[in-house]
Amino acid sequence: MLAPLENSQAHVDFLRNIAKTWAESVRSGHLQKYDVIPLIKTTVMKSLEYSMALTTIDEATWRSILSPVLQVCLPKAGVCRNFPRVVVMAPLSLQGLGIPNPFASQISAHLDMLLRHPAARTEAARYLENNLQSHQLETGTSFGLLQQDYSNTAILASNTWLKRIWRELESVDMYVAFDSPGLTLPREGDALLVEVFMDAEVDQETLKWLNWCRLYLQVSSVADISTADGKYIRQAAWEGQREQLWRQSY
């Protein structure tokens, strides 16, 4: 689940094949109008929803996956096949057809993963916590991964499942707060290096290179690379040499 890489295109092709195969089987069958939409909800949608906790497919791709189903089933339900999708996927209470929006269902599955497992203290919760703390060290900021601005610090994070969830939630203006330990500052007046770089308004490419240097040195704050009086950067940091710090987050 938390592996840095995923074969997303293969998964999209697999889901699209499920939808096309199901649509072809329905095309040749005889159905009553009032049976079509309940059939979609209870059969093909369940197959598509099965892996949604792990997929991070964007909304446009989900619409293309579901398109063969709607192209076949809407006419059978007495509805124009090109009926606006916003109405097709709207709930019955808002005079829609009530067909689940797969992108919304995917977000719901992700929120369930993020909220249910930590509350139940499952094994998956441990992996989530470890991954969040790894990202905390990687981005070097005082906020948890899901509370950061994606456009500012996404370039600093590895491409994991959590990063893709972060991007997805920000696209719909949602965030999830986790009670996870953050990076601590050992001195008064100290500051995290990444936040110093961001306050200096360096560009994204420079920020990425500075962060790589910070990760190589295994430091997080100004105090980690400065002299005891805080006035100068130690020679080892200039020369790219790691030092054994009295406190170590890595």
Please provide the spans of the model-predicted regions.
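Extended C-terminal regions of large enzymes
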Residues: 65, 80-250
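Basic, alpha-helical interaction scaffolds
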Residues: 1-60, 64, 72, 76-80, ...
